[in-house]
Structures are given as C-alpha cells and as structure tokens.
Amino acid sequence: MKKKNIQTSVLSMVIAACMISHQQNARAGENPSLQNDSVPYVTMPDVSPKLTTGDGNPLLDFMFTADPTAVEYKGRLYVYATNDQQQYETVGGYGKNSYEYIKSLVMMSSDDMTNWTYHGIIKTDSIAPWIKTSWAPSITKREEADGKTHFYLYFSNSGDGTGVLTSTSPIGPWSSPLNHSLVDTNTPGIAGECKAAFDPGVVIDDKGKGWLTVGGGCARIMRLGKDMISVDGPIKPIKAPHHFEANELNYINGTYVYTYNIDWQDFSDWPLPTEKPTTCCMSYMTSKTPLVTKSWKYQHNYMKNPGDYGYDYSNN
C-alpha cells in the first residue's frame, strides 16, 4: 500500500500526525455546509479541532494518518486518509505495523490550506462488512443526471483488491454499492500477473470518463463504466519500471499523468536512457491514450525518498 513515513507536509500532502494534545478547537457548525449532523457509520466529533499553527502542519495533531487523497468541492479541499491510529490503538502502541487492523478512513478539510477541520472517521467495515481492511484511498467526484454531485471513494481492500464507497456529500453518509471488491487479484488482466490489486488511483477526464489504476509489483489501468463501479473493457498494463506501489492518476491538459513508488532495487538493470531514479522514490509517466501500453512514457523521479533528505528511509 501507499506506506509510510509518518511525517506531514501540506506541500507533499503526506498526511500524518504527532501524538500531542490539541488546544485550539472550532465548531464545525460555524460553516453551514459542515454541520456535525448524525451520519450513519461516521464517527463525528462534538467539537471539531481546527489547527491554526503557522504553516498548517501537521494537518491533524492528535492521530496518525497516511496515504492522502483529496477532492475540491465548493471552495474546500477535502482530504481522506488511512486511519493508522486504529492500528496503533489496537496493538497498544508502536511496534511492527502490518496494517491488518485498519478498517476505517479519516476525513478532514480546509478552505485555506492552513486551517484544517476534522470531520471524523468513516467506518468502512460497518458500511462494507465484506472488507478485510481499508487503506490508501483515492477519491473523485462528478455531477450526475440527478443534478447532484456524487463522490466515489476507492480504497485498498488489503492487498487483494480495490473497493469503492459512494456518497452525495463529501463527508457522507457513505454506502457500499457492491458487496465485493471492484477488482481483485482474480480479475482477468490482473490475475497471475500482479502480486496485488491495491493502492487505487482514480480520475475523471474532460469527457467525463472515469479511469482507475491499481497494482503492486506491476501497474494496471482500466476504464470505468458510466456508473463508476464497474470496469468497461479490458484491463491494460502500464509498464512502469521497478514498480512497487502507491498508484495515483491525474488528468492535466489532455494528458494522463500516472505516479507510483519505485522499489528498493539498485537499478543496475535500469531499462531507459533517462537518469536512474533514487531508491524507493516517487516517479511519474504520461500518456495521451491510456489503454495503449506503448503510449506510456517514463518522465522523471519527482520526489526522492525521505532518507535522501536526512530523514529515516521509508516506503513512500
């Protein structure tokens, strides 16, 4: 999964937290669009902490989170993350983190990228009892025929597959439109080829079509059905050199931009004329025709591992 040096930066959007008490609080009800109403299967705080610390880091100072994804809605940026705090509390503190107890997601938002409001926990295992875990979310939105904006929140159902939750509000209530993963390691195009079908990255292009990337040890891309909860056509490979995990997909001025985490190898077999990347870094590829495997071009190592900047080495 998209794991995990527990550091936080607005610039890199790598969300985590320091285990310290919070003193500054602001009621979510101050903004009419952020009422703390009762939402099924969402744990909402009575008082929502709102940080005003300098540059706004860490985004949440009272819990561990990771693997952020974000969507803009009505002038606010809504961020969703893996709830590492659930693992921490279940095992009783620090120790080997195998992530198996993480079955929820965290919500927060900001309208200025400095002051962050905590919107509570999405209880994924209550909404979708069939899941094993919920890690590394990816979200997108689209206005549908009913005139409402629909939110589509994809997540890793352990390493085996990718699930999806839907809502007509960025803070829920959320529902599970399927009683199983959207894709998993038994899905044609993934089965027998990828070690994992997790770490989703979703985007909707300027024609309104949804696209999803998944994979661990290899990368796969698929066009989503109009309903955003089905696959439309074959699943195709993206030949991402030394692929490890942490898939994400964006669409920028007609170009599909795929980002991923490179593995820990020494790259003596680096297959491209470009400069070799650094160990376990973030890299990106681009394409105009995403289902044509040969169209994907490796571009650059855009973010080195934290270890290259004097911090501890970690996955991504």
Question: Residues of each region from the PLM?
Answer:
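Bacterial Sec-dependent N-terminal signal peptides
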Residues: 1-30
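Carbohydrate-active catalytic/glycan-binding domains of CAZyme proteins
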Residues: 29-316
